[in-house]
Amino acid sequence: MKAPATIVILIMSLISVLWATADTEDGNLLFPIEDFIRKFDEYPVQPKERSCKLTFWRCKKDKECCGWNICTGLCIPPGKK
């Protein structure tokens, strides 16, 4: 009796994936996730909002600040870690 239940679960999973794909641009399921990550990549959390540690994120070509030294709130230029 496990086989019919497994088939039903697989079919329901396929339907939900197809349903979600239809709602995104170009059928890319990761599109909303990429936007969410990009938002936090471009606007990093300020030092007061995090614990005291060294934090880096991806540097953009047009940005001078590539990371925060959380303890002092200093902006670290690209290439210096």
UniProtKB/Swiss-Prot annotation:
Family classification: Belongs to the neurotoxin 15 family. 01 (magi-5) subfamily.
Taxonomic lineage from the root: Eukaryota, Metazoa, Ecdysozoa, Arthropoda, Chelicerata
Keyword Glycosyltransferase appears in the UniProt entry: no
Domain writeup: The presence of a 'disulfide through disulfide knot' structurally defines this protein as a knottin.
Gene Ontology CC: one annotated term: extracellular region
UniProt-recorded Gene Ontology molecular function terms: sodium channel inhibitor activity; toxin activity
Keywords for this protein: Amidation, Disulfide bond, Ion channel impairing toxin, Knottin, Neurotoxin, Secreted, Signal, Toxin, Voltage-gated sodium channel impairing toxin
Cystine crosslinks: C52-C66, C59-C71, C65-C75
Protein source organism: Macrothele gigas
Name of the protein in its database record: U12-hexatoxin-Mg1a
Function: Blocks voltage-gated sodium channels (Nav). Intracranial injection into mice causes lacrimation, slow breathing and death. Intrathorax injection into crickets causes death.
Residues with Proline amide modification: P78
Tissue expression pattern: Expressed by the venom gland.
